[in-house]
A protein has these predicted regions:
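Beta-strand-connecting loop/turn residues
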Residues: 69, 209-210, 229, 301-305
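Core beta-strand-centered patch of the WYL/Sm-like small regulatory domain
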Residues: 11, 146-276
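Polybasic (Lys/Arg-rich)
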Residues: 254-351
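Bulky hydrophobic/aromatic content
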Residues: 89-184
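A structural signal for short hydrophobic beta-strand segments in well-ordered beta-sheet cores
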Residues: 64, 204, 234, 297-298
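Short, basic/aromatic recognition patches that contact phosphate-bearing ligands
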Residues: 1-107, 192, 345-351
């Protein structure tokens, strides 16, 4: 039996009811709200009180929709019928549609960089943004193998990096890698001591279900990418970060994240090249998925099409190896020879 609550909580309980039980497909009358107040909150309220509190919520900025109808009601003094406005079919407009919430939840479920327990907690919070009728895919969590990261420091790492980037400070951290025991261990130096990385952080970005830190490793003048779920024991240093525009690839410009992500489809750190390659016609969708729509197609025939793309050299090499023999690098010659050599070495393994 519900515990009786003070009247001053009426407005909050009505808001809670609208959040839990209403949407465009499930509208509530004042009678419905009164019954839920009584059964779940131990409160009684007449229709005038409910309507008054709903009006107050609307005045506070809550988007509450309703339908309005007119009925004739006798004037209590004169008995003459008068128009009376009846409000009903109340529902609270959501910040997110069910489809949007499902998209967010599925993104969490199949993102391996978020620890299992924290993923489950986040899904619960997203579910709380909808109502009792919302059916998310939480069953997928129970069925998913717990192959997500073991690193429980992920969210603290993100917060500290966000602060370091805002303040323009370097950070230090240890970096994890898997051993044959299937557990993560800190990377070590040749002498066996744990290696500490000192970097200048610039941006964090998600790619292919993984979360990366784009930064500069202190010893060099180029860009490095590190998996956030493998960063541990991160500390903000007092030393100012190296400005991105001072790096050799920056050409005096600040980081353009959209361009960087487009040119680094595999998040490898190496020089960009103008790559010309031949692909089978069936590969066109894969090319656009990986390199974007700014590629140029030419010399199309039944066998294939030639593609020109400005991209990261290591990424182009990996793409050509992954999709051989349907991809043939034409230019630059240096890259063509590297791919050829890698394929020859791979073939030797099978001889």
């Amino acid at each position: 039996m519900p515990v009786k609550q003070p009247k001053k909580l009426l407005i909050m309980n009505i808001l809670d009811i609208l959040r839990k039980y209403s949407d465009e497909e499930h509208r509530l009358s004042q009678k419905d709200i009164a019954e839920i107040l009584k059964t779940e909150y131990g409160m009684t309220a007449d229709r005038k009180a409910i309507r008054r509190n709903i009006l107050n919520l609307m005045d506070c900025g809550y988007n509450i929709e309703y339908s309005e109808s007119i009925r004739m009601v006798p004037n209590p003094k004169t008995g003459v019928p008068e128009e009376s406005y009846l409000w009903s079919d109340f529902y609270l407009e959501r910040d997110f549609t069910d489809g949007e919430l499902r998209l967010l939840i599925d993104s969490l479920l199949f993102s391996k960089h978020i620890p299992y327990s924290q993923c489950k907690e986040l899904v619960g919070k997203l579910e709380g943004l909808s109502n009792v009728y919302f059916r998310s895919r939480v069953k997928h969590i129970a069925r998913l193998p717990e192959d997500k990261t073991d690193n429980k420091q992920l969210f603290l790492t993100i917060e500290l990096l966000d602060e370091a980037i805002s303040r323009g400070r370097k950070v230090s951290f240890k970096y994890l890698e898997y051993g044959t025991d299937k557990r993560q261990h800190s990377k070590t130096r040749p002498d066996g001591t744990e290696r500490v990385y000192i970097i200048s952080p610039y941006q964090m970005a998600a790619k292919e279900g993984k979360y990366y830190l784009i930064c500069n490793y202190d010893k060099y003048d180029d860009i490095s990418n590190y998996r956030l779920d493998r960063i541990t024991e991160l500390k903000i240093l007092d030393e100012p970060a190296k400005p991105f525009e001072h790096l050799k690839w920056a050409n005096g410009r600040t980081l353009d994240l959209a361009t960087y992500m487009k040119e680094h489809p595999y998040m490898y750190a190496s020089d960009n090249v103008r790559a010309v390659f031949r692909v089978a016609k069936a590969m066109v969708s894969d090319v656009i998925d990986l390199f974007g729509t700014e590629v140029t197609f030419s010399d199309e025939d039944d066998a294939g099409v030639t593609v020109t793309a400005f991209t990261n050299e290591m990424a182009m090499e990996q793409f050509a190896l992954n999709f051989a023999p349907d991809v043939t690098v034409l230019e630059p010659q240096r890259l063509r020879e590297k791919v050829k050599s890698a394929l020859e070495k791979a073939l030797e393994k099978y001889n």
